[in-house]
Each structure stands twice: as structure tokens, then as C-alpha cells.
């Protein structure tokens, strides 16, 4: 095959199959450029690589072969386990692809720039998606289930009545605030007139858009609701002290308009892990004439 390439000319050589390289390859190939893409590893993905159970077994074997000797360790005891023995029953059932170890887990909002690009580029034809069924967050010493809809909030056992009312009122306030300034990437029509139990919170949000989000939340909610809003609804770290109320509302609105698009939750995940994104882009590039080399 190498001889077949001797007389070929390429416009671009791309090294690696990370998400950025794969997306660039797909774009250039669709633009009629001649691409050759090389990855020194056996599989696609780079930093977004994921292993099924069999891949993980082989990866662990390679690690064991390259493990440093005990004599170099002063205060660490190496414990070797037979990975193959532990995984044997699962491997024999030929369902090893149902178990994935993702190096860099990623999910998509059902309505977002990324999901729109995947559909428009037809890369989505090469990916199978599942909806993320449940999301939990840690509060004190318990895992709490995050409700996604009005009905789920009402029946939640993790929130008391006052917390439910406050959370619903906050969600409706954000929707009402952002409905008048819908992002161009949103294709979801949301009701323009939303009834609020109390306009006070809506006015507080509207009049404090430049305030630090963490300060605003701590003023109006207890720690449980504050954590839920920051971690899940706005997809932020609890230590993010710089995010404003306006930025928080933008993030929450993106979350809310993705609910009930494909399922009750707003998130989509590739069935076989994040490397599916890079593989889809690579396949799209290959369909348009690119040549790939892996180890």
C-alpha cells in the first residue's frame, strides 16, 4: 500500500485523531482537499479515547509489561491482579462492547451548536446515541437525584415542599427572562407567557444580572438548591466565583430547552464512548477521499 502512495500528492498531512484534528480533516475533505491522516496508536480518539472491556484488558497487559521494577519503589506496594481472569465471564458472553472506560467523557445537550453541527455535517449518521437517564449529585453524605421536569420536581423525595416551589419559580423565571432573547442556535419554541407564583424572584434576577451568581444563589436559596443549580442546571464548578447571574441563566436556559427533545433528560451520550465523535468525523473524512494510517 505504501508503494501506491508514492505517486500521490496531498494538500494536508494531519497528525493524530483527536477531536480537533478529526473535525479539521472532515471539513477539509468535504472542501475537496486531499488529506492524509496518521495516528501512531491502534485506535482513534487521542485524548477522547475509550476502551471496551477487551481493549482495557489489552491495555492493562501493555501496562504490566512496562511496569517499573519493585526495587525502584520505596513506599509503594505493587498489587497485580489477573485482569483476564476477572473479566473472563463477560468476555465469553461477547457483550464486552457494552462496558466502556472513557478517558474523557463528553455529553451533548440535545439542542446545541455541537448537536446541530453533527446533524448538518451528517457525522451523526455514524454515531449511535443514548440519553442520559439520570443525574445525581453529592450533597452532604447522600447522592440526590436531579429532577428534570415539573412533574419530576413535584414527586421528588429529595426536596421538601418549599424547595420544590422555589426551584420551580426559579426555573420559570429564567425561562421568562430568556424567552425574549432566544439564542440563534435554538430551534425550540417555548411558551412566551409563563405564569409565576411570585414575580419577586423574576425581578431579582432581572435587576441583578451582573451580580456574581454564587452570591445571588446563596442569598435566595439553601445550600442544597444552590449546589443543584450550579452543578447540574448551569454545569459549573462550585468554585466558579466569577460567573455572573446572566451567564448562569444562559447556561440554565440551554439546559432547559434540551429537556424532552429526545427524552426526559437534556443530555445525549455516544453509545460506545467519546471516541465515537472522532471516529464519526474520521469516517466522514474517509468517505470524502481522505487516507488514514493507524498502527
Language-model features, listed with the residues they occupy:
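Mobile amphipathic helical/loop "lid" adjacent to a hydrophobic cofactor/ligand pocket
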Residues: 82-245
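Helical element adjacent to the flavin cofactor pocket in flavoenzyme catalytic cores
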Residues: 253-295
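Alpha-helical interaction elements in eukaryotic regulators
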Residues: 20-24, 52, 110-114, 213, ...
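Active-site-adjacent "gating/activation" loops or surface patches in catalytic cores
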Residues: 237-262
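Eukaryotic N-terminal low-complexity, Ser/Thr- and Lys/Arg-rich leader segments
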Residues: 1-9, 59-70, 187-188, 242-250
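Structural signal for hydrophobic/aromatic residues that build the beta-strand cores
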Residues: 12-14, 25-28, 35-39, 118, ...
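Beta1/beta-strand and adjacent pyrophosphate-binding region of the FAD-binding site
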Residues: 4-20, 36
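Glycine-rich FAD pyrophosphate-binding loop
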Residues: 13-15, 29-54, 64-75
